[in-house]
Amino acid sequence: MGWLRIERLEPDFAGWADILALIHRAFAYMDGRIDPPSSAHRLTLDGLKAKAGKEIAFAAYDDDRLVGCAFVELRDGHAYLGKLAVDPAAENGGIGRLLVEAAESQTRRVGLPALELQTRVELTDNQRTFQRFGFREIARTAHPGFDRPTSVTMRKDLA
């Protein structure tokens, strides 16, 4: 691994197709493991650009190679971390942690006291990783049409 850096992306960023491909690669391992399937599969280039226009996007680079991304949505009382994705070929290199730290810094910068995220009930490894990053479970919710919890909401207090 080379030199890792995190960049904040602007809506006019030229590499949205690369970000979309990264998200699809990073979320592919969930196929057949989670129900309902990840919304990442429904994300289109236009949808991603629209998301970037409303949220704060970050990209992680290993030298000049795109290896991760994350989106931060500013909400009432907290920020929401979504579409955190790390290239499968670059996993376990600290990229996810750097992206979470960038999201935390942005959340603090705008004066919000907490960062929340959701992961799936079946993805217990992800839950443990986020716990190591200081997040705690605050709720379990069900997707429409499900009578059981499908998502775990986690929160990290930053104040």
What is each stretch, according to the model?
Residues 74, 87-93, 121-122:
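Active-site acidic-Proline motif in GNAT/NAT acetyltransferases
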Residues 86, 92-105, 132:
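Conserved acetyl-CoA-binding loop-helix of GNAT-fold acetyltransferases
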Residues 1-14, 159:
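Conserved N-terminal entry element of GNAT/NAT acetyltransferase domains
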Residues 3, 49, 113-159:
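C-terminal "cap" of GNAT-fold acetyltransferases
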Residues 59, 65-73, 78-85:
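Conserved beta-strand in the GNAT
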Residues 11, 21-48:
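Conserved GNAT-fold acetyl-CoA-binding loop/helix
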